[in-house]
Design a protein with these regions (language model features):
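Surface-exposed, low-hydrophobicity beta-strand/loop segments enriched in small/polar/acidic residues
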Residues: 1-128
Length: 128
């Protein structure tokens, strides 16, 4: 799997409470032509084991505004329990679905409970 730093949402981002990804990806100006294409490959994984929290749910969100005032969730995981959130765990969203219309894309991590440790890495990748 190959990460491009300009296409990363999170690089070892600590999650102790609900938060948006550190980075937002700008898909470009309106009326762009990025081809018919296919789903965009996405990797979201645990880079350091979580402790303290109850669960995490990951959502892919899009918006026409970089501030995400009217974010639309296009796909999300179920709530993943703490017992599964060990280093190496991969969340079950493997791509950004086709037809995402907003200019900006980010991830949102919904944390239940109070986390004391744990990090995620996420981004658009080649070679999953």
């Amino acid at each position: 799997m190959i990460f491009d730093s300009t296409n990363k949402f999170s690089t070892d981002q600590a999650l102790t409470a609900t938060a948006a990804s550190t980075n937002v990806i700008d898909l470009g100006v309106a009326n762009r032509n990025i081809g018919v294409g296919e789903n965009i490959p996405l990797y979201i994984g645990v880079s350091a084991t979580f402790t303290g929290l109850t669960s995490i749910q990951v959502s892919v969100q899009t918006d026409s505004d970089e501030a995400f005032g009217t974010a639309v969730t296009v796909v999300q995981t179920p709530a993943i329990p703490l017992a599964s959130l060990k280093a190496g765990y991969q969340f079950n969203i493997d791509s950004v679905p086709r037809g995402v219309l907003g200019r900006y894309v980010r991830l949102n991590y919904t944390v239940v409970g109070t986390g004391t440790a744990g990090t995620v890495v996420a981004g658009i990748v080649a070679g999953i």
